[in-house]
Amino acid sequence: MTMITDSLAVVLQRRDWENPGVTQLNRLAAHPHFASWRNSEEARTDRPSQQLRSLNGEWRFAWFPAPEAVPESWLDCDLPDADTVVVPSNWQMHGYDAPIYTNVTYPITVNPPFVPAENPTGCYSLTFNIDECWLQKGQTRIIFDGVNSAFHLWCNGRWVGYGQDSRLPSEFDLSAFLRAGKNRLAVMVLRWSDGSYLEDQDMWRMSGIFRDVSLLHKPTTQISDFHVATRFNDDFSRAVLEAEVQMCGELRDELRVTVSLWQGETQVASGTTPFGGEIIDERGGYADRVTLRLNVENPALWSAEIPNLYRAVVELHTADGTLIEAEACDVGFREVRIENGLLLLNGKPVLIRGVNRHEHHPLHGQVMDEQTMVQDILLMKQNNFNAVRCSHYPNHPLWYTLCDRYGLYVVDEANIETHGMVPMNRLTDDPRWLPAMSERVTRMVQRDRNHPSVIIWSLGNESGHGANHDALYRWIKSVDPSRPVQYEGGGADTTATDIICPMYARVDEDQPFPAVPKWSIKKWLSLPGELRPLILCEYAHAMGNSLGGFAKYWQAFRQYPRLQGGFVWDWVDQSLIKYDENGNPWSAYGGDFGDTPNDRQFCMNGLVFADRTPHPALTEAKHQQQFFQFRLSGRTIEVTSEYLFRHSDNELLHWSVALDGKPLASGEMPLDVAPQDKQLIELPELPQPESTGQLWLTVHVVQPNATAWSEAGHISAWQQWRLAENLSVALPSAPHAIPQLTTSEMDFCIELGNKRWQFNRQSGFLSQMWIGDEKQLLTPLRDQFIRAPLDNDIGVSEATRIDPNAWVERWKAAGHYQAEVALLQCTADILADAVLITTAHAWQHQGKTLFISRKTYRIDGSGQMAITVDVEVASDTPHPARIGLTCQLAQVAERVNWLGLGPQENYPDRLTAACFDRWDLPLSDMYTPYVFPSENGLRCGTRELNYGPHQWRGDFQFNISRYSQQQLMETSHRHLLHAEEGTWLNIDGFHMGIGGDDSWSPSVSAEFQLSAGRYHYQLVWCQK
């Protein structure tokens, strides 16, 4: 044990937090979760241990701008003005200094290993009583599961130790410091340390004791470590459980270890052995270690699909059988290996349906509770995810247990990121930083290696490629050859990774960056000598209204076996709750706390909002990742299962046929598909519709029974096909009254019964409509070529740093947002049975014509207004965001009814999950509340839209809400939006895709850009 004076002054003088060679003082070695049961049955059933005591709760807290401001007296007694905070928590969430959101740029001046003199410091203290029997014998430890960034610990005024690495436990022996009765802990937490240079992840920078604190009482002679691993024969019919157990203490020669393996209430295998029997080399063996091997016949294998778990109980006892201590862990029999360029799980090539997940809570910052963790896992499973990357640090210990039990594959990632360094490997190639990096990798492995869910180790994130990575890669491969190692830094295919693991590589497009080219994922596989599998560590940047082009990745994954999936960036928006002057909550992002530097809304890249409400993009991910694929041939549906191990034992296939949303026939049958097999389902003779319309066959896979992660009735997969339809010929209708045209100097006015249409001759726009005396429009019907910019449209562009390549900057520079309209034509003609208004407009900026729009409005005797639009786009203007019409309707109706794709928001490059049907939703549900307002709520493939007294028919896309595109463009946060008068309607003949390969470069694929020179669309507007 390192001895140091208890004086605070000496601690401050040492400045351990500015020395990369000092990562800890007196911290105990890393190990798996301990509970120190004194009863084997309690260990087997994972009951709460009497030897484990939580110290979570209210602690005294005082904040100081720097450690030098902390008074020496605080070591012995609470300060009179100390506050109370809950542990675990981030002190920024309690009003002490501010959270900082930055992606790449360090939040402090870069001068490693030194940190600013103004280093916010939190002083925590807790007074507690200790169980006196704990003082009489044994060892009492204190465990801090997570403290950011570094801390010194005192107990009863005496210095205990020091720790850093905010995402792994720091554990200390308190035995020599405790006394009978009351005891006082004092923890001085520093916001910044040299460790902060290794923790430059894209997240909020927060501080404090943000994970659990607990006391653990162990016997003097104790289990100090244990490691389990599973080995198999070729066909997985026989397995061996290897358990390596290490002890410390006395009576070594008289001790025995028993390892028993349980499956529920049944003991499967057991073995007992003394210590020191295994020869390691010519000098002998470890006197304090032993390895037991238990044979298991026909083991129930673990996978994310079927997470079969056993329970291993490790008992330390005397030769006569007296139990000293028991530890235990869940065991999953599974094998991970790479063979012939494929990542195999239990001999099968696994397709990673993955997502990156930050530990984030909108109210609690980086504090994770079990309820939130379970909620995340259930949502992931329900949306067909099978894997999660712990981005970019080891997670709360409970997370891994839950992943074991519910079934998720885990990439466990070391808490190392130096993204803001120039070059990025400045520290990771420096041997002076190897000890700090080594602690972060080795301790992660030692803590988490018993978890079957952990199938891949990661050396960290965005830290370049340095010699330290190579050393740590070799260490892991030596200590744990049972798992592959991945690391993206330095080009995603260095010697420090077993898997090609690029981020944001595109399907077909090379990005030939200097030094670290990012090849298309298809090309990467074919590079000379490249035999590794490719799994994208990050892809499909889900920032705001995004995930366009996701289907293209999944087409490639299914086409090329060595393209084994990837991890979407990312799971949850990292917005935080603030409150306005009236106490109303609102969602904040970078800069909203006065934090500098900041990267604005770049913290919100989630498939779910911070409160775990799904984004519409989540449904697209669910559909593309579904485990059942379908093919229709005649009346036969071929169902292919992509499950590797699971037979479809809880699935019904429901099919239905509908004509323009009207059900014609349906049926249901059980699915009986073996893993990686097919089932042919013959449908009955389908009804022939008597009328015309779109005829669709829809299939859903429904789980009739509840599972551990879903309720009864959960839909896991679906598909639609458009069937052959009857052709129709428009027959002449019975004569109607002929609309009457009235011409004045200002207007053309058409009247039919109680309806009137007014066209302003000076503007050429439909300026008003009446039903009776009620006006229908608040603004004229106009062309629209813009959208409120998406995050993907903005990219990295900002007011002080313009990116001219961003879509929004191209549109601005070309004048799309500032275009003024010039009337070219506005005429009226009386036809035999209708009135025809013909208009032409030029949309211009600084004397240059960007668009010419020619329209005809044909109002017939039935009251229908048929609108035909032809648009010419200048060849040298950027491709527009949309080609459509917009107006502000006077009515605010409660519901919107449409025949088209839905029910969720969908866009041309993100619509495979949408289904064609007749949908009916509240108006409020047509708006997607992205925290940073943008274009939202589009519904594509629409044949009919009904709202209030109005109906629109044609083939178009639309969005409808209380917010104009102008307001969405000008508003920084969703809570600042105000419902405008009436309802804004946008009807598009054509709409550009949204992109999503990344959010900092134009990523809309060419096929989803509006690159043609001419566009034509039609629609009919009438009153119901």
Swiss-Prot record:
Q: Where does substrate bind?
A: N103, D202, E462, E538, Y539, A540, H541, N605, W1000
One GO BP annotation is: lactose catabolic process
* Cofactor remark: Binds 2 magnesium ions per monomer. Binds 1 sodium ion per monomer.
Site (Transition state stabilizer) at H358, H392
Catalytic reaction annotation: Hydrolysis of terminal non-reducing beta-D-galactose residues in beta-D-galactosides
Q: Which cofactor does it need?
A: Mg(2+); Na(+)
Q: Active-site residues?
A: E462 (proton donor), E538 (nucleophile)
Pfam families xrefs: Bgal_small_N, Glyco_hydro_2, Glyco_hydro_2_C, Glyco_hydro_2_N, LacZ_4
Write out the residues that bind Mg(2+) 1.
E417, H419, E462
What InterPro entries does its record include?
A: B-gal_small/dom_5, Bact_Beta-galactosidase, Beta-gal/glucu_dom_sf, Gal_mutarotase_sf_dom, Galactose-bd-like_sf, GH-type_carb-bd, Glyco_hydro_2, Glyco_hydro_2_AS
Q: Which residues bind Na(+)?
A: D202, F602, N605
**Cellular component terms (Gene Ontology):** beta-galactosidase complex
Ordered alphabetically, the record's keywords are: Glycosidase, Hydrolase, Magnesium, Metal-binding, Sodium
Enzyme kind, highest EC tier: hydrolase
Q: What Enzyme Commission number(s) does the record list for this chain? A: 3.2.1.23
Q: Which SUPFAM superfamilies match?
A: (Trans)glycosidases, beta-Galactosidase/glucuronidase domain, Galactose mutarotase-like, Galactose-binding domain-like
PANTHER family according to UniProt: BETA-GALACTOSIDASE
Subunit relationships: Homotetramer.
Return the similarity comment.
Answer: Belongs to the glycosyl hydrolase 2 family.
Q: What is this protein called?
A: Beta-galactosidase
Q: Which organism is it from?
A: Escherichia coli (strain SMS-3-5 / SECEC)
